[in-house]
């Protein structure tokens, strides 16, 4: 674990590792393995992958036992490894790094917590098993097709559950993938109005992209400031606060944020790009 974290999480108090960072580690450090991660998963798909012998990792909701600040909503996210299922009991067997091994989790409860993260899932498998994985994923094998399916599902869920902040957040996240930034910003507006969890921007950064690319710099700055109140060492929030400062004409403040993001995460490609961008002006 520490061998991996030294590369993708060099600061031990970093509260988040993105799933694409995990995927990059597999691709660059474990050449005998392949990985896939998709969004918009389902209970049936998880069962199919497990039945074929593939453990599946998902990102889902976790609640802390104690508060870290006044009026802490205790909501957080973490990765959960699924290693089996029991249709009779309607449960998955899960490996939970916070609680312990081989814990049952009901299908319904898992799906409710999984929705908050766009039902993302990841699997790692030997190269020779790629045809089987491709067959199981079927229409979701193509990342673009998968995102379109997730976008359609989020549209349906936000229409059927208009008070569900995660349905709107997922809609925005999938719109960002297709660079519909104005539409995504509107979806995130709805999610904000309904009230997303206090730590949401520790794990997901679609609102930053949506507000930046739709020209809503004041909203971008406000969100980045809020995210840093909750997670002061978030390199992603520092990066986007830096871009907000840049848009507002505060180049020195932008440079300081980009440098701090890089200091927190050495090699952070987006921070390196931002610093190079400022240097080229």
PLM features: residue spans?
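Terminal, low-structured helical/coil segments at or just beyond the last alpha-helical repeat
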Residues: 255-281
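Register position in tetratricopeptide repeats
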Residues: 177, 213, 247, 277-281
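Noncatalytic regulatory segments and standalone regulatory/sensor domains
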Residues: 69, 73-74, 83-176, 183
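Alpha-helical adaptor scaffolds
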Residues: 172-182, 189-243
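Cysteine-nucleophile protease catalytic domains, especially the papain-like/related folds used
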Residues: 1-45, 51-52, 117-141, 174, ...
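Active-site-adjacent substructure of cysteine-protease-like catalytic cores
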Residues: 41-95
């Amino acid at each position: 674990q520490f061998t991996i974290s030294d590369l993708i999480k060099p600061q031990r108090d970093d509260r988040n590792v993105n799933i694409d960072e995990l995927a990059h580690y597999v691709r660059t450090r474990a050449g005998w393995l392949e990985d896939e991660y998709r969004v918009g998963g389902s209970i049936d798909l998880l069962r199919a992958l497990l039945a074929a012998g593939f453990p599946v990792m998902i990102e889902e909701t976790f609640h802390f036992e104690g508060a870290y600040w006044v009026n802490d909503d205790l909501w957080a996210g973490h990765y959960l490894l699924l290693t089996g299922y029991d249709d009779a009991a309607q449960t998955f067997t899960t490996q939970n790094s916070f609680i312990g091994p081989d814990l049952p989790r009901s299908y319904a409860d898992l799906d409710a917590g999984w929705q908050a993260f766009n039902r993302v899932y990841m699997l790692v498998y030997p190269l020779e098993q790629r045809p089987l994985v491709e067959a199981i994923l079927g229409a979701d094998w193509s990342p673009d097709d998968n995102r379109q399916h997730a976008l359609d599902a989020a549209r349906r869920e936000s229409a059927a559950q208009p008070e569900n902040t995660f349905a709107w957040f997922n809609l925005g996240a999938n719109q960002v993938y297709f660079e519909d930034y104005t539409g995504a910003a509107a979806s995130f507006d709805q999610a904000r109005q309904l009230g997303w969890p206090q730590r949401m921007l520790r794990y997901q950064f679609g609102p930053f992209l949506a507000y930046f690319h739709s020209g809503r710099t004041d909203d971008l700055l406000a969100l980045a400031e809020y995210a840093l109140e909750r997670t002061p060492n978030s390199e992603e929030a520092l990066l986007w606060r830096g871009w907000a400062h840049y848009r507002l004409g505060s180049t020195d403040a932008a440079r300081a944020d980009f440098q701090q993001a890089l200091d927190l995460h050495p090699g952070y490609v987006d921070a390196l790009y931002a610093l190079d961008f400022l240097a080229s002006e």
